Amino acid sequence: MVMKKYKIGYTSGVFDLFHIGHLNILRKAKEQCEFLIVAVSTDELVRKYKNKAPVIPYEERAAIENSIKYVDKVVSQNNRDKMSAYMKYNFDVMFVGDDWKGNHLWIKLEEELKSKGSEIMYFAYTNKVSSTLLREVLNKIKEE
């Protein structure tokens, strides 16, 4: 068995309307760590910061994540405080989409995690697929 770079990895998201982009992130994350924790945003959290409810309820989104072979543990994400997640799960690396790279809040988080011996690894998003795009297509179909 090949040793992976990290012992515990962590990623989080809504994972609404699960698609190949989600699967790619989970696969890439698992390639880097022995144990992958996936935090799925609760319906309340999504409503709070996106001002809309997810299409798929939390329990079903968590069940989907739990059935994926790359995922070792599913937890609920009740807030967006990544340092509290670090304190709770003590991960070696956090996996994040590269659209956050360079954002001042994430630069600060990188520094905080580094001081604890953890880091952030950014992954490129899969082109031309997102839950938002899927939602738009479904709405167009519904209108026809």
Residue ranges of predicted features:
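Nucleotidyltransferase catalytic core that binds NTPs
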Residues: M1-E144
